[in-house]
Amino acid sequence: MIRFLGAAFAAALLLPVASAETVQLAAADGVKVFGEVWRASGAKPPIILAFHQAGSSSAEYAPIAPRLAQAGFTVLAIDQRSGNGAFDGTNRTAAELGRKATYEQALPDLEAALAWAKANSHGAPVVVWGSSYSAALVFLLAARHPGDVNGVVAFSPGEYLANKTAVRDAARKVDVPVYIDQASGADEVGQSAAILEAVKSTDKQQLLSPSNSTHGSSTLRADTNPAGAEAHWTAVLKFLKRFMPS
């Protein structure tokens, strides 16, 4: 599959990857949001904003973001206020906040990341990428900021919010390319399909997962999905190539 990625995209795979740098953002309600940035080489690389699943942090993307950066994308992965220490990480935002937060209450953190992307993209495309509950929130984010989001990647989205139609309602306003992946269980596949059907854009796709898959973005991690991660990588990189400069 890699032979179809195109010359510019394939060349980006050979570029060196910088180490992650820590950033601090300010949400609209004053909450301090911590994150890590992996910067791609080259002029005006597209940006991926990577959001984690429940009980997690930016550490979910520690083995994922460097590969995306090597493929030519600058990646910002944040610690949302709704999260914890999965994947051997520490959620600095939640720790400093000092109280539990609902999934919906994390939306300002995603908006802070989007504001960072607007200030740093220099006109390059911005892709919002969610995992589990944040895969639900990225549809709300894209619906609220239609001029600022160029693509949506959602791993294991579902109607996880208090309003059980909120994600589909938002998806009906999303008119940018959308990619959905999920674990192979019937419930996850069904929830993903319902959300994808609601998406306004006609440029949308769902990976009907192979048997080797795990929940959320962790399906790309070799430590959690050793037998299946590469199949998911092939599919998502093929989708992402449209955002690379020609």
Per-range role (PLM):
Residues M1-F4:
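Positively charged n-region of N-terminal signal peptides that target proteins for export
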Residues G6-P16:
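Bacterial N-terminal signal peptides
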Residues Q24-R39, K44-N120, H215-S218:
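Serine-hydrolase catalytic machinery in alpha/beta-hydrolase-like enzymes
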Residues A54, A95-E104, Y160, Y179-G185, ...:
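Second-shell loop/turn segments in exported
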Residues A113-K173:
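Primarily recognizes the serine-hydrolase "nucleophile elbow" in alpha/beta-hydrolase
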Residues G151-S211:
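The feature captures the conserved acid-bearing segment of alpha/beta-hydrolase catalytic domains
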Residues K204-S246:
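C-terminal catalytic histidine-bearing segment of alpha/beta-hydrolase fold enzymes
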